[in-house]
Amino acid sequence: MAIRPIRWPGLAFVSMAAAMVMVPTVSSALEAQITRTRYGIPHVLASDWAGLGFGTAYAFAEDNVCLLADHLVTLSGQRSKYFGADATVTVAFQDIRNLDSDAYYRGTFDDAALRQAVRSTSREYRELIRGYVAGYNEYLRRIGSAHLPVACRNAAWVRPMRDIDALRLNEDKMRLASGERLASAIVGAAPPTEPVASAVPVADGVDAWEAITGRLQVEFGSNGWAFGAETTGGAGVLLGNPHFPWTTTNRFWQVHQTIPGKLDVMGVTLSGLPSVVIGFNRNVAWTHTVSTDRHFTYFELALDPKDPTVYHVDGRPVRMETHTVSIEVKGGPPVRRTIYRSMFGPIFSVPALGLGWTREHAYALKDADELNFRAPDAWLRVERADSVAGILRAITEPVGIPWVNTIAADRHGDVLYADVTPTPNVTDQTPASCLPAKVNAPLAKMRLYVLDGTTAACDWSPSPKPGQDGLLPASRLPRVLRRDFVANSNDSFWLANDLAPLRGVPDIVGRVDEPQGLRTRNGLKTIHAAIAGRQGAAGAAIGPSAVKEMIFRNHNLAAELALDDVLSICRQSTDALTSDGKPVSLADACAVLSRWDRRMDLDSRGAALWVELWAPLARSGAGYPAAAVAFDPKDAVSTPRGLSLESDNPAHVRTALADAVTLLASRGVALDARWGDVQKAVRGERRIPIHGGPGSNGVLNMQEAAWTPGVGYVPVHGSSYVQVVTFDEAGPVVDAVLTYSQSTDPASAHFYDQTELYS
C-alpha cells in the first residue's frame, strides 16, 4: 500500500508533469484553466467564482459525465421513463425501486422553495453554481453525444443541466442522513381504508429501523484525527479518512481550486457539488466524520375520525396537503402517486416501528436539513479560513454543515473537534408531555424522537438566530480546541479526547457513558500507544509518517479482544454443529486462527475466516458479543473485552465458527486464504487486491465488502479519500490517495490508477 505525496503547486505547476487546457465558453463570458497532473488531478484556475464553477464542472464531466447525467435523471424523477419502474437506484445508500425514487423526488423536492432558499446565499455561491451549470453543458456541447463514454453514449437521458438541477444536487446531499433515509416510507404512505394495528415489540422495532433505513453508522463512516503541537512538536497534523461508497453518486473527486487573491484550496468534493468539502489550504486542513446527531424528529398526528387526511392542532382541524405526480414508465402507462404533507413535513408510514398510518394516528417527518442552503457558504468560509479558530467561526455562524463532525489542524499547532450541525432544538428540558410515552418507549434505544403533533407548543423550540429557527443554537453544540489531539470515528462527542470527556450536551446530539464502536476504541488505543512510545525518545514528535503507519496498520481490534478466548473454546472441543444442525470439525479452522497475524493485510491468512465468524457474534450483542469483562464507562477504551465462557456461550461461538467454515467452503475459499486473494476491486479486467476490513472488527482502514461469486469480497464502501496533512514554511505537506480513482469511465487510465496505488 502506498499513498502519494501531493506537492502544493500554487499557480505555477512548474514541477509537475501536466496537461493544460484553456476552456472558454462559446461567448467567452466564462473561462478557466484546467491543468491535469499525475493521476488525473485537475487544478482549476479562474479569475472569478463563475469561472471556477465552470472549470470545476467541465473537469468533473471529463471524468464522470455519465455518473452525473444519470444522477440528474434521478433528481428530476424520470428513472422509470428511461430505465423502467422496477429497476433500482441508490438513494441515501439504499437501493429502492425507480418508481419510488421518482415519486420521492417529484413529490418532495419543491423547486419554487429551492429557488427561494438559494436567494439567501452569497453572491459567490450563486456565481459558482451558475458557472458549474455552464461548465457541464459546455463539456456536453464540445464532446457530442456520439463521443461520450460507452455507459451513456447517444443516450436519450443525457441532457444539459439546468439551474434548478444545481439546487436539487445540493438538496439531495443535505438530506442524505435524514429525509432520504425514509424515501420509500414517504412514497408508500397512504390513508387507511380499514383499521390498522400499530403496536410492535421493541426488538422488532430495532430490526425494522435497520431494515428500512440501513445502519447509518456502518454505511456512513470515517476516521478523523488531528494532532496539535503538544504531540507533533510544531505544526498540526491531520488525518482525514472518510468511509464513503466506492460506487454511485456519493463518490469523492479530487480537485485543486484557485482564484488568485481569493481562494486556494485542494481536496475532494462530492459528485455534483462545486466546492471542496474535505481538504486543505495553506494554513489549515480539515475533514469530516458522520455525527451521531438526529437531524430530524417525527410528529404524531391525531386524526379526524371521519377523515384520516385531517389532523388536529390546538383543537383546530388541518387538512393535509397533497402532491400527486404522474410518472412516465418505460413500456407502460403512466403511474400516479400521491405524497401527503403536514405542517411539520411529509407523512411516512413504517408499521413495523409502530409508526403506521392508522385511523387514529399518522406520523410526519420534520427535517433540519431540508432547504439547507447555509451549508454551501459554510464550506466556502471553511476553505478560506486561516486557522482552526477560523474554521470554528465558519461553521458556528451559519450552523449549516450537514450531518458531520468537523476535525481540523492548522500550521500553528492548534486542533479542533466540533459537532456543529443543524439539529432540532429538542433538549432534556422538552416537556415529557411532548413525547408520548407509548410510541417513544420502543424507539428510545435508537434515539428516535416522536413529538406530540396535537399542539404547536411541542414543535421545535424557537431559536434566536434568523434562518436557524427551531435548531439548537451553536452554543449548545459540542466543540473543543486543544493542543494535543482530537479524534472521532462516528461515535458521539463524548470521547473526542478521552483525557477530557465532553458532557452536558442534549441527548439528541449524542450520548455519553455508552459502549464505543471498535473503530473509536482502536483509534484511541493507537493514538495513546503512539504518544507513549515517543515519550522521552529522540524525534518524539508524531509526524505524518507515523500517522500513515497508524491508519494503515490494518490491526483487527476484535481479534485482539476476543480471539484468545475463541482459541480457548477450541481447546475445549473442536466438534460443533452448524446453526442448521450439521456436524463440522473445527480442528483446521482453529489451527488457522491460531496462526493468523490478526491483521487485514494483503498477506494475512485466516482473515476471511475471522470476518465470517465475527459478523454473527457482533450482531448477537449489538456490536460486541457476551463479554468476559463488561463495559465500564470509566474504562471505555478497553471495555468490553474478551468472550464470556459461561453458560451456553462457548457452544454459540462454536456454532458461529462452524457456520463460517461451511460458508467459506460453499464459496470455494480456503480457510487460510491470503486476504489479498479474496478481497479485490474490479476495474474492467483488472482484479486489484485490497487490504483493510470491516468496521465492525475495529479495522481503522475500513472496507465493507460484498461477496461476488467468481471474484470474492468486493469493496462497496470504506476508505475512500485518505489525506495526511501537515505544514512547513512553504505551505501544506500532503500525502493523499483516492482509493477508487478519479474516473468512472473504464476507458480512462484514471479508472484504476489510484486503486493500484492504494493496493
PLM segments and residue spans:
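Bacterial N-terminal signal peptides that target proteins for export
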Residues: 2-15
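Boundary at the C-terminal end of the N-terminal hydrophobic targeting segment
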Residues: 19, 27-32
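Substrate-recognition/specificity elements adjacent to catalytic centers across diverse enzyme folds
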Residues: 30-249, 260-262, 266-275, 280, ...
